[in-house]
Amino acid sequence: MIRNIAIIGLGTMGPGMAARLARGGLQVVAYDVAPAAIERARSMLSVAETVLDALGIALPSAGVGTVRFTDDIGDAVSGADLVIENVPENISIKADVYRTIDGLIGQDTIVASDTSGIPITKLQAHISYPERMVGMHWSNPPHIIPMIEVIAGEKTAPQTVATIRDLIRSIGLLPVVVKKDVPGFVENRVLYALLREAVDLVERGVIDPEDLDTCVSWGIGYKIAVIGPMALLDMAGLDIYKSVSSFLNADLSNRDDVAPMVLEKTSASKFGIKSGEGMFCYTPEQTKALQAERARKLVAVRRILEGRE
């Protein structure tokens, strides 16, 4: 049974993951090599806890469900039943983490990667116990979005998948078991298909970025939040889908490289909110207000989808 969890690498996702796991009654030790990252995570943790309160997710019993921060990786993984690796999307960096913890963790400890899309089979090549390694892909923001993908690599034991699936369910979240270890898994493959088409339409001057966001948020997104793609096909009618896809599919973007617009912006260090400019511009004040507004709206939507409003 999993009770003690180590999170290796805090970044954007770590604090929210830690907060949600702790709210489920689990003991969490959160590690990062950078003191600044730990301090930032402490601040983000309190914000995440406020959001969890708004979601009505009850506090666990006294003495359980705690989060402790450390800059000592050995301390972090000592006694851990589950280690969640949450370092940057780079196989070499992840492999370094696996080599470091290899001799520090117990023989029954499960190692899960929060990779957004690196095949788990590739990561298993860098660990001594591939049968105990699994993908555990959270969606951002992790303390609000309840869906978590569970992905087996070629050498992952079925029991490892079952253990992580059951853990996710036990704390009130929604596990989705991905049956094949494809790059990007499921969520990001669907998302990046949408983003590729969206960027292409803006780049070709078909629509302005603001109008595209309105179209998707109040058109596709408004429906998809309630009706999944497969159910939407049934609602619209497979005969209609057959007819439209017979001529539209050939005209959709099928580029297999990075769009020039994205390359131009990233080469100018325009990364989005984190740099103050991307597709749109953001002041520090706007960023803070935007993050609060988005969290509030996501909480409201989730409560409605759960039938609590």
Swiss-Prot record:
Gene3D superfamilies: N-(1-d-carboxylethyl)-l-norvaline Dehydrogenase, domain 2 (1.10.1040.10), NAD(P)-binding Rossmann-like Domain (3.40.50.720). It holds the Pfam family 3HCDH. NAD(+) binds at residues 12-13, 32, 87-89, 94. Optimum temperature is 55 degrees Celsius. Homodimer. InterPro entries: 3-Hydroxyacyl-CoA_DH-like, 3-OH-isobutyrate_DH-rel_CS, 3-OHacyl-CoA_DH, 3-OHacyl-CoA_DH_CS, 3-OHacyl-CoA_DH_NAD-bd, 3HC_DH_C, 6-PGluconate_DH-like_C_sf, 6PGD_dom2. Optimum pH is 8.5. It comes from the Bacteria. Transmembrane segments: none annotated. Its EC number is 1.2.1.100. Disruption phenotype: Disruption mutant cannot grow on a synthetic medium containing pyridoxine, 4-pyridoxic acid or FHMPC as a sole carbon and nitrogen source. GO terms for biological process: fatty acid metabolic process; vitamin B6 catabolic process. NCBIfam families: FHMPC_DH. Belongs to the 3-hydroxyacyl-CoA dehydrogenase family. The lineage of its organism: Bacteria, Pseudomonadati, Pseudomonadota, Alphaproteobacteria, Hyphomicrobiales. The keyword ATP-binding does not apply. This is 5-formyl-3-hydroxy-2-methylpyridine 4-carboxylate 5-dehydrogenase. Pathway: Cofactor degradation; B6 vitamer degradation. The record marks 137 as: Important for catalytic activity. It catalyses: 5-formyl-3-hydroxy-2-methylpyridine-4-carboxylate + NAD(+) + H2O = 5-hydroxy-6-methylpyridine-3,4-dicarboxylate + NADH + 2 H(+); 5-formyl-3-hydroxy-2-methylpyridine-4-carboxylate + NADH + H(+) = 4-pyridoxate + NAD(+). One of its GO terms (molecular function) is NAD+ binding. Involved in the degradation of pyridoxine (vitamin B(6)). Catalyzes the oxidation of 5-formyl-3-hydroxy-2-methylpyridine-4-carboxylate (FHMPC) by NAD(+) to 5-hydroxy-6-methylpyridine-3,4-dicarboxylate (HMPDC). Can also catalyze the reduction of FHMPC by NADH to 4-pyridoxic acid. Keywords: NAD, Nucleotide-binding, Oxidoreductase.
